[in-house]
Amino acid sequence: MFCFIQKVLSGIAPRVYALILLCAVADAVFAHGALSDQVLRGFKVPETPKLVGKSAIVVDQQAAVQLGKALFWDGNVGSNGTACASCHFHAGADIRHINQLNPGQAHTANADSTAKTFELPSGNVAGPNYELKAGDFPFFRFADVNDINTLTASTDDVVGSSGEPTQQFVAVNATGVNNDQCNSELSAVFHAGGLNTRQATNRNAPTVINAAFNFRNFWDGRANNVFNGQSPFGLRDTGAKIWLAKGEKKVKAVPLALENASLASQAVAPPTNMVEMSCQGRTFADIGRKLLQRRALESQEVHLEDSVLAGLRDPSGTGLTLTYAELIKKAFNKKYWKSDATIELVKDSGQFYSQMEANFAMFFGLAIQQYENTLISDDALFDQPINDATGFPDGFTEEQKRGFRVFNDAHCNNCHTGPTFSSAASPQIFLNTAKKPRYLKLVNRDVLGEQADGFDTDSSLFDIGFAITSVAPTAYDIGLAGTDPFGNPLSFVKQYINVLTGNAKKMLDPVIVAPCDMVDPFTEDYLSGELINDKLSKSVCKGAGKKQAKIPAPEIVAAELAKSGEGRLSDGVGAAFKIPTLRNVELTGPYMHNGGMKSLEEVVEFYNRGGNLTNPRHSTTLVFFQGMSEQDKSDLVAFLKTLTDERVRWERAPFDHPELVVPHGHEAGINPLEINLAKDRYLHVSAVGSKGRTAEQGPLTSFDSYLEP
């Protein structure tokens, strides 16, 4: 994209004004892209080196996929019947609408008031077990939906996902009873009538379909690209180890570092999270102890024509013939499970585990990754062969063609770029290049928009694939500005600033930041006397690039960071979130990290008015008033629906699945398993085979179609 910066006058037309100021997220991305540049068909998921092979970790990939699919859909994984799929059963996302509200617990600046109470801008009285209505959306209300200055009501509440009740872990049952042994503690927030309800997460659940292409996962990117075999945090977690067999009776703890394994990093977070899937204090080794001797999916129907599991289906139709231990032995190298040694994972705890139990997090994460790598939706109308005469696939309506032009004219594809319609994908994917890039560009410096005070412009550092979109005030959820459990910044930019200040010798994550390859290198706006040579980018900044391989000296960095707005070292990190894919977006509501919009129409209104608030760091956002007509809005929604893969809509292979009973709010009465818990009500998800849903079942539909007025 051709980018230029200039002073502008306040009288300029808003839409033209936005176009003048917009620059590409990455310099290789252009504003008016050809449709063919975003077709996904033919793209392969980035390979995880040294993972699959006869002497590698995974020795039977198909068995690993089978194991991963079973684990993903098995309600036994959770302490109280929650599966991974409980939050991802509908086009990879969650369309439940009862007991899904979180009071805004990520709003740490207001932790003792609104972050503990439920306030919907609709005026409806909400709380635990509340059933969301269509009229509760959107969560930011405007007298004029086209005017950002007419806000009338808002909330820090979030539509999350219902998970587990508040309980302390005691023990698992290796056979028999599915639920773990746990002791209830009265929740300060999630209770009704003196009984604990299931908690709801403080962010909306994104789709897992096409997540295999993402360089990092989770809204805040904390699921590291490098999988360490135990936790989501990659090489940051220096205590993470796996166990190798050294003969029959001995094991050795060794580190693991698998690149392009963010899905595995993501997969190991929810099962031990006390809100999502676990009683507090349960470990992955405990989950292994619970599952290994059980038949996979022992209580759930498996369809006779399941595209992955049919060959392992038990004759009864319920579950598989194999136990999880047997599936692991088929899928993984025996050096990770064959030892008879017992391992005390926590010193002096007196609690010992088998090698297979101790490595269960690794088996779980990698198997889930192998399964989710198959969930690629590359057969939407958008992906069909292009008619040379029209420039569009056959079947595109005039409305959809106009919508694609609106999508480009409004610069939606500055963020929703590449074949996945997300710059959070691995750079090789979103740059749509067959040639392997010389390095992975994950940090940039650019002018993205106006300065809050007047119309000056500045350059800001930002993590590619994450954006500030003005969905809610920064204090409601800081997103990418958060830290890991070890106190380290999640953001690559914040890590880089630590390097520039001299507080760190190198990046915490194995990421190269190349100032010579930034849209706005430091040589653009720093004096030569303020700069020093950058030693860390030598491998990239060669030849002509050496002249721009300069960074500000530590004392200059300190002076800039002391300025209001951080001067020439401003960043786009606070309240930045991972840019989601737009594929199948018709089916994956509610939308945004807070789930505050029920429909694509509300999303388009949001972007048209320039967000929900005027962001104080407007130089780091691409969300501006667009001035769309009603026809433009309708056309844009029509185009977005061309990104729906009919296999996803009808749950045809590879999107078929076993039966699942999903917790969906509570009904009157006490839970028969625990006198302090409210009685669950359930949503039954039928098993579906490779041919997909029947005509009687009908297709999956949008989130708002399930809501009462």
Question: What positions do the PLM features span?
Answer:
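Periplasmic c-type cytochrome electron-transfer domains
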Residues: 5, 13, 30-709
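Cleavable N-terminal signal peptides
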Residues: 18-19, 29
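N-terminal signal peptide c-region/cleavage motif recognized by signal peptidases
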Residues: 25-26
